[in-house]
């Protein structure tokens, strides 16, 4: 059973998810992506995803990740990665939980590669905005799942630019800050709740976000 849910608000700094940067050595970066070390980083990140959100099975399939570099990837003379930030978005299917797994990679000053899993699906929100928005999505789901005390984000789905309520037109593809909305599927105690999430820009380089809990 899925329920659809109107607005509470949060504020977060938005880091553009479409600001791509080239790597200093594309061939070396491709070699890194094909390495066993990289595979280990991915598998470790995926192991942290809650089992009710994603788990592997013998029929798991993936078309391979789409990589979006948001800060240039560089390498030192010894071949170690010295800087870089990027997303890897991995479409998966075959285990009754078809989705896109999102993994964030950031290279620290000591060349350590840190990984963080974002919420699965096609959300356009960055990690900071996801972190703030999820509290309101859980709050929305809890209004229906009152007996449940734990929720997870099962999936996110980007729905489009522009908002209906309040009426906010899309500012266009040439604009860095565009309002958009998504549907977040929340799972709690075996029940699924579809929660609309709205994201709209303010003049101070912040985004407001709202989660809905009113039935359509």
Give the label of every model feature segment:
Residues 8-17:
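Bacterial N-terminal signal peptides
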């Amino acid at each position: 059973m899925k329920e659809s849910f109107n607005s509470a608000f949060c504020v977060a700094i938005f880091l553009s998810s479409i600001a791509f940067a080239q790597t200093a050595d594309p061939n070396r970066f491709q070699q890194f992506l094909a390495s066993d070390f990289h595979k280990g980083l991915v598998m470790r990140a995926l192991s942290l995803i809650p089992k009710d959100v994603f788990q592997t099975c013998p029929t798991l399939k993936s078309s391979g990740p789409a990589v979006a570099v948001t800060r240039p990837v560089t390498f030192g003379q010894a071949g170690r990665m010295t800087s870089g930030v990027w997303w890897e978005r991995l479409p998966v299917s075959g285990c009754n939980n078809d989705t896109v797994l999102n993994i964030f990679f950031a290279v620290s000053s000591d060349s350590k590669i840190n990984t963080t899993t974002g919420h699965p699906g096609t959300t356009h929100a960055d990690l900071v905005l996801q972190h703030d928005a999820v509290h309101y999505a859980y709050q929305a789901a809890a209004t229906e799942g009152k007996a449940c005390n734990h929720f997870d984000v099962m999936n996110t789905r980007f729905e489009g630019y522009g908002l209906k309520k309040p009426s906010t037109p899309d500012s266009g593809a040439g604009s860095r800050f565009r309002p958009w909305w998504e549907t977040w599927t929340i799972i709690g105690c075996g029940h699924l709740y579809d929660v609309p999430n709205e994201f709209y820009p303010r003049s101070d380089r912040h985004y407001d976000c709202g989660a809905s809990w009113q039935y359509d």
